[in-house]
Amino acid sequence: MSFNVRGSFRDARKKNAWRNRADLNVATIGCYAPDVIGLQEAQRGNLGAYHKRLAHYAHIRGPRYGNSIPHDFNTILFDPERLEPLDSGGFWLSETPEKHSRSWQTKVARSATWALLGVLGTDITFLHLNTHLDHVSALARQEGSKLVVRKIAEISGRTDVGPPAIVTGDFNSRPDNRVHKTFTESGFVDSYLAAGNEEGANTFHAFKGALYRDAHPARGPRRIDWILLKDPEGRLRIDSHKIIRDADEDSGLYPSDHYPIMAEFGFQATGFRFQE
C-alpha cells in the first residue's frame, strides 16, 4: 500500500483534522491489511495512532523531511510475521543526499526511506523504497526521481541477489509527465497499468472524493500516487492494483486527502503472494 495520510498537525481547526478522521484512517488500513505500507506525510500523531492501534506492524521511520517542526516522515510499515528487515536506510532528495538539505528550487526538504525485506521461511528478498516528491518545483521532481533511480541501483548493487525493487510514493506528477518516464525508461513498470487499468483516475481528491473532478474539470485526472516495480528477471508478478475510495458516508469524512492505493504481487517460482 502507498498512502499519503495527511499529517496529523495539519487542518487542526477544520472538519478534516486528524482527530476527526483518525478512526477511519486506521480502520481503512486495518481492513485491507497490506503486508507492507509506504506512508507519506506521516507526522507524530499519525505514527502514534499506528503504533497503538496497528501494533502488529513494525516501523522503519526513515529521515525526516520538511523545513520545520513538526516534521514529516516517509515511514515504511511491514508485518514482521511475514517479513524481516535485512537492511534499511534513507536519504534526502538533494545534491547532498547524506544530510537534511534542499536543492533544485524545492519548496521543502524531501527524503526517501528504503528497506531490504526478506520473506520469512523463504530465500526471497525485495527492496522497497518510499518517497514524496516536491509539490512546487518541476525541476525538483525530475532530479529527485533520477536520484531515486540511481540510489536503487546503488543499494541493489550492494546485495548478492539483485532483488526486485518496489517504489511507492506521492510523486506530485501525472503519468504523462517526465517523472513517470524517468522510471519507466529505467525499467520500472506502473502496477496500475500493468494490472489492466485505464488512465483517467484520481488518487488526490482534496477531501472531496468523487466531487473533486467536478469541482476542478480543467485540472484533469490526478493519479499522482504510484506503486512501481523493477524486476528484470521476472521474479514478481503483478496480480492486481486498486484505488481504495473508502469514506464515512454519514459524516462525509475521508481517511485522507489522497486515496490509498494497493497492489498485490506474486512470486513466480513459489506462488507466495503479498500485498504492497
Please place each PLM-identified region on the residue numbering.
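Structured beta-strand-rich core segments of catalytic domains in phosphoester-bond hydrolases
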Residues: 36-129, 133, 240
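Active-site metal-binding loops of divalent metal-dependent hydrolases
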Residues: 3-5, 131-133, 170-171, 259
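Metal-dependent phosphoester-hydrolase catalytic domains
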Residues: 82, 139, 153-165, 173-276
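His/acidic metal-ligating clusters that form di-metal
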Residues: 111-129, 138-181
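Active-site neighborhood of phospho(di)ester-bond hydrolases with catalytic His/Asp-centered motifs
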Residues: 37-40, 62, 166-170, 190-194
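N-terminal, active-site-proximal structural segment of metallo-dependent hydrolase catalytic domains
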Residues: 1-53, 64-72, 146, 269-276
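Acidic/histidine-rich helix-loop elements
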Residues: 2-23, 93-107, 134, 211
